[in-house]
């Protein structure tokens, strides 16, 4: 994605330079960076979020965050028709900090620990025909290993692979094993499952039940109420020595049964949806300064007219067959050739919710 949006930045620079030939390189660069950042924010708001939380009410809400309830066609054609962010969306409205300077809160960091989405194994496939190139452990794609991997595999094939391979489920016992034994470039070895839990404790994040109380959600009275999986509830009771108030927030959220269609827990969603709006509403470049004077008319059109599929196809047109008919680039792409079924990589299930690794946060090296 860094490579993809670097290419997108350069394409925006070319557009701006073509219209404003007298501008300095620095002004072109900084303006393109603004436009690129706003496009990423739009993509994250109305595409990525609605893909991981495919719920009609949420999809309406996230679209309203960006375009307002008046809808995308009205906003794109006529611009803001109201000062109300509910009607015309947050971008271009008046900035508001709601009583506190903006920051990504510690609670937001807690709910954004999405490591179980990363699979341990990936079947790398070719964008031209869907043929299998090789099966790799994800650690072969991480850190310094990524350089040698992309020496062998073209980025377009990696893009196609990520479009047709499914992520892991946000559930217990599904934390990537390679992240539980992660060797950093300096030789230090980390158990990221343990780090995730310890960071929350160090930062004073309330334990799971208290976290829910502070969100005005119903706390659980028994371990069995948290999850219908009796094996999980028994393990939770054992690890936390029968004290439900000691459950760590990450462990609790991975234990919950998510609402229908949600990729993560309802508890995590409550924080997520608050910050999804606040990170836009508190940023002057998405509010007071979200206008043609700052972004240029060409920049505003670029943001309005493009989405993730457009970005991908601009720089990797070979992906067109895989994306044909796909309305959201973060949803599964077409497998090539169309209709062909590919055997899964070892240990990987087609149904996201069925994939399990052998260990997870409950089994990590952290005492309650």
Where are the model-predicted features located?
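Terminal regions of secretory-pathway proteins
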Residues: 13-14, 19-368
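Structured, charged N-terminal subsegments at the starts of enzyme catalytic cores
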Residues: 1-14
């Amino acid at each position: 994605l860094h490579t993809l949006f670097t290419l997108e930045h350069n394409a925006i620079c070319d557009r701006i330079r073509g219209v404003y030939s007298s501008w300095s390189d620095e002004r072109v660069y900084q303006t393109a960076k603004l436009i690129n950042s706003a496009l990423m924010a739009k993509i994250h708001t109305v595409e990525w979020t609605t893909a991981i939380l495919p719920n009609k009410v949420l999809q309406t809400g996230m679209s309203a965050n960006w375009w307002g309830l008046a809808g995308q066609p009205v906003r794109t054609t006529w611009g803001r028709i109201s000062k109300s962010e509910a009607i015309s969306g947050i971008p271009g409205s008046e900035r508001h900090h709601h009583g506190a300077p903006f920051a990504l809160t510690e609670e937001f960091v807690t709910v954004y620990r999405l490591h179980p989405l990363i699979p341990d194994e990936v079947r790398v496939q070719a964008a031209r025909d869907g043929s299998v190139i090789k099966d790799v452990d994800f650690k072969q794609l991480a850190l310094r290993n990524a350089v040698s991997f992309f020496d062998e595999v073209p980025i377009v094939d990696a893009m196609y692979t990520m479009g047709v391979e499914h992520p892991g489920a946000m559930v217990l016992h599904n934390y990537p094993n390679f992240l539980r034994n992660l060797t950093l470039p300096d030789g230090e070895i980390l158990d990221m499952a343990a780090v995730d839990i310890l960071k929350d404790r160090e930062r004073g994040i309330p334990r799971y039940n208290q976290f829910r109380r502070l969100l005005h959600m119903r706390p659980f009275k028994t371990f069995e109420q948290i999850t219908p999986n009796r094996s999980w509830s028994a393990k939770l009771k054992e690890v936390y020595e029968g004290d439900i108030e000691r459950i760590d927030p990450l462990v609790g959220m991975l234990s919950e049964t998510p609402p229908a269609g949600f990729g993560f827990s309802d508890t995590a969603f409550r924080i997520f949806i608050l910050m999804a709006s606040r990170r836009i509403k508190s940023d002057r470049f998405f509010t007071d300064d979200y206008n043609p004077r700052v972004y240029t008319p060409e920049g505003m059109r670029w943001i309005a007219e493009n989405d993730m599929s457009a970005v991908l196809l601009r720089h990797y047109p070979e992906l067109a067959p895989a994306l044909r008919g796909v309305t959201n680039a973060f949803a599964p792409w077409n497998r090539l050739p169309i209709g062909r079924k590919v055997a899964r990589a070892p240990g990987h299930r087609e149904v996201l919710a069925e994939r399990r690794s052998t260990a997870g946060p409950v089994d990590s090296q952290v005492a309650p």
